[in-house]
Amino acid sequence: IKLAQKYDCYILCDEIYRGVDTESLELYPSFSDYYDKAIVTQSLSKVFSFAGLRLGWIKGPQEVIDLVNYRRDYHIISSGPLDDYLACLVLENKDVILKRSRDICQTNKLILKKWLDQEPLVSCVIPRHGTVCFLHYHLDIPSAEFCEKLQKETGVFFVPGSAFDIEYHLRFGFTQDEKIIKEGLITFSKWLRQFDHQSIDIQL
C-alpha cells in the first residue's frame, strides 16, 4: 500500500476467498479498508457456494465504478430477477453460510495435515486462507503423466501442477466431502508405495 501511495497507483485485489479464514470467525480487513484507491472484487461463487448465480461485486473509487457501470451496460445490462432474489437471500444469511464454509475448510485442512505427517513422498505448506493448495510430490515424474497414471489406476484425480506452471505439484481443494477426501488420500498413499525407493529432492 505504501508503494502504491507513493506513486499514486491503484491496487486491484480479488478477495473471492475472503471469509474462510479458518483461524478466526471475524472477517479480515479488505484492501479497501486501508487504501482509497483500492479496487476489490468478490462473488457468490466460492465462499458462499453459489457459483450458479454468476453474481459478484466490485468496490472501488467512484470514478472507477462509473467506468465499470458504463462498460457493464454493454456486456450484461442486467441480471435475472430470480438470481437477484436468491443472491439477497444468500447475503441475508451470510454468517451461517460463511461458518459452514469455514467449518468444511477447517475439517479438511486438518485431515490433509494428518495425512501429510504420515506420507513421506508428499509435502505442502497449507495456506491460512483460501480453499486450495498445491501438494509437492518428491518424484521425478511430470505432473500431467503422474496425474493421468494415478487416475487410470485408482480413479483419484488431481489437476497437474503443469497447468499452473508449477511442475511436480498437484492442485488440491479443501471443499470436497470429508469422506471423499479421506478415502481419496488413503487410496493415493497406497498407490504411492510403488515409488518408495524413487524419492528424490526436486529443485524448484
Segments from the language model and where they lie:
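Active-site pre-lysine segment of PLP-dependent enzymes
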Residues: 1-10, 15-50, 63
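Helix C-cap/helix->beta junction micro-motif
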Residues: 3-7, 119, 154, 195
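Short amphipathic alpha-helical/adjacent loop interface patches that line ligand
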Residues: 4, 13, 72, 102, ...
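Conserved core segment of the aminotransferase class I/II
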Residues: 37-106, 113-115
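Conserved glycine-rich beta-strand-loop-beta hairpin in the small C-terminal domain of fold type I
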Residues: 88, 104-113, 124-137, 168
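A short linear hydrophobic-aromatic micro-motif
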Residues: 120-124, 156-161
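PLP-dependent enzyme catalytic core of the Aspartate aminotransferase-like
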Residues: 140-141, 148-158, 164-204
